[in-house]
């Protein structure tokens, strides 16, 4: 697909969703992300999936099954990029959700359960 860089997303709030098709807790978190995406779409907000699967087709299939329509990036084959992202965001497990502010700073990070994302977004967008 289209090339997308995190620097392209500057000026917006971004949720990075680190996940994989084989990760059951990751997949179970998608309905919650769909609600968040619907609520804040059109605001200064973007959701980006960062998946780690052997094949892009597997990610596409999982995204279709889970009805997620935000951009997905597969970092499995891109070892350097994967290592860089894992180090930059200190990813030790998935699912991990990271909320980044318009300046590119991490607001909050959730490993596993991301229920607290709602509170953070409500504070930001007053919704």
Report the location of each language-model feature.
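A short beta-strand-turn-helix
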Residues: 1-14
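Conserved redox-active cysteine motifs that mediate thiol-disulfide chemistry
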Residues: 10-11, 18-35
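Active-site acidic short loop of glycosyltransferases
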Residues: 10-12, 42, 68, 91
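Short beta-strand segments
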Residues: 17, 47-51, 74
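Short, internal strand/loop/helix patches
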Residues: 60-103
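Thiol-/selenol-based redox modules, centered on thioredoxin-like
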Residues: 99-127
């Amino acid at each position: 697909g289209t090339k997308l860089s995190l620097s392209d997303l500057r000026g917006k709030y971004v949720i990075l969703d680190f996940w994989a098709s084989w990760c059951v807790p990751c997949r179970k978190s998608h309905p919650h992300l769909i609600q968040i995406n619907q609520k804040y779409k059109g605001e200064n907000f973007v959701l980006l999936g960062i998946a780690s699967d052997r094949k892009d087709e597997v990610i596409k299939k999982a995204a279709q099954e889970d009805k997620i329509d935000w951009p997905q990036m597969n970092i499995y084959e891109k070892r350097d990029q994967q290592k860089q992202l894992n180090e930059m965001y200190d990813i030790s497990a998935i699912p991990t959700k990271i909320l980044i502010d318009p300046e590119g700073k991490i607001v909050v990070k959730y490993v596993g359960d991301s229920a607290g994302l709602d509170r953070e977004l409500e504070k930001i967008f007053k919704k």
